C-alpha cells in the first residue's frame, strides 16, 4: 500500500504519493495539482475545491475559506475573533467553541471547523486514491512550526475522521529539506539551510543546522499578516483604481465587485509568474459594466514594491537572531505557492549571491513531496533514497512551563523546555515543601496556554520536608509524559499529553 503526504495549507491543499522509490504530487479531478482549501454548502451538498472557490461570489455566506486559521481555537481566542471578522460565513459561539452558521434554505445548521477540515482531507484522500487506483490510509500530515497542542490535535482528528491513519505530523521546514534530500549529499560537516515559505496568508522563515545527516531547527519567524493574498489585494486595489479612472465609479467599498476583482487579480498574479503581462477581464463588474485591464510584470512589481521589501526583512532579522551572516548559509529552499514570484526569487538571490537557491521542485509542491518521503520512511520503503541515518531533530516550538501550587496558594513558574529545545529531551524538577503539605498541583503551559495539570494528593504529614520530584520526558513527536513522585512515600501520579509542542 502506498504512503502519502498531505499539506493542508491556509488557502490550498496538496497531496503527494510515495511509490516506487519516489514522491510525486498528484492532480485532482479538475486536473490541478493544488486544490483550494475552500468548502461551500449548498442545500444538502458540500462542494470542495475550485468549484467552491469559483462559486463564492454568489454563495459567500455559505462558503468557508481559511478554516486552518480557526482549527483548535476557542471562540474567544484572538485568532478566532480575527477570522470571524474576516469571514463572509457567519461564525458563532457554541459552548465556547466557534461554529460556522450555514443556511441550507430550509434550516440553519452549525458546522465545526474540524468538520470543514475533514471534507478537505477527504478530498485529498479521494485525489490520491484516484491516482493510485486503490485505497490509501497511511499519511504524514504537515503542520506549521508554531501550531500548539490543540491545533495539532484538531488537524490530526480531522484527518483521521476523513479515513487517514496519521503516521506522523511533520513540520513544514523539515518536509522541505527531505524533499531535496538535504543532508545526504554532504553528510560530513556542519551546514546551514534557510527555508523560506510564502503561502497564501503567511510568511515564515526558518534556519536549520544540518550536521552528518541530522537536521536541527535553530530559529523561525512567522508573519501572519503577509502572504500571497497580500499581493492579490494590492493588485485588486490597483484594478479598482483603474476602473474608477475609466468609469468614474468607486467600487472599493462594494464587497461583491471587490471579490470579482480579487478573483481576477489572483489569476493575473499567477500568470505573471510565467509571462510578462496578464489580461484582467471581469464580466459585469458593476452596474452591467464590463472591465478589462492589462497589467505588465513590471507594473505588478511596482504596485507591490513595499510588499516585496516586507517579504525580505524577516530573512535579515532571523539571521541576526541566530548570529549568522548570509555567507554562513549554504542553501536556501523556497516553498509556498507565492515563492514562485520571479521578483521575490531575484531579491533572495541578490541577498545570497553565492548560495544555492533550491526551487527545482515547484515551491507549492515541495512540502507535500517531503511529507510523502517521510511517509515512505515510516512505512519502511527500502527503495527510498534517504539513508536511515537521515534524522530530523524536532524541537519545542514554544516554551513548556511548569506551574506549582502548594497548600498556601504559592505559585512557582519554571521553564523546563525553552523554545528550540532539541527533542527527545528529559527534565527533572524537585519541589521541597513543608511536612504539613497535603497536596501539590502542577500545571503545564505551552507559551501562555494551559495544556494539562497533575495533582499529587493525600500526602502524609511528616516532620521533615516533602521532596516531590517531577520528571518530564518529551518525545520527538512532541508527546509529553509527566511523572510526579513524593520520594519518602513513593506516592506517584502520571499523565501523558499527545503532541504537546514539537516542531521539526
UniProtKB/Swiss-Prot annotation:
Free-text function comment from the UniProt entry: Component of the ribosome-associated complex (RAC), a complex involved in folding or maintaining nascent polypeptides in a folding-competent state.
Family statement: Belongs to the heat shock protein 70 family.
Keywords: ATP-binding, Chaperone, Cytoplasm, Nucleotide-binding
GO biological process: one example: protein refolding
Top-level taxon of origin: Eukaryota
Subcellular location: Cytoplasm, Cytosol
GO MF annotation: an example: ATP-dependent protein folding chaperone
Protein name in UniProt: Heat shock 70 kDa protein 14
Keyword Plastid: no
SUBUNIT field: Component of ribosome-associated complex (RAC).
CDD domains xrefs: ASKHA_NBD_HSP70_HSPA14
InterPro entries: ATPase_NBD, HSP70_peptide-bd_sf, Hsp_70_fam, HSPA14_NBD
Main location class: cytoplasm
Annotated GO CC locations: cytoplasm; cytosol; nucleus; plasma membrane
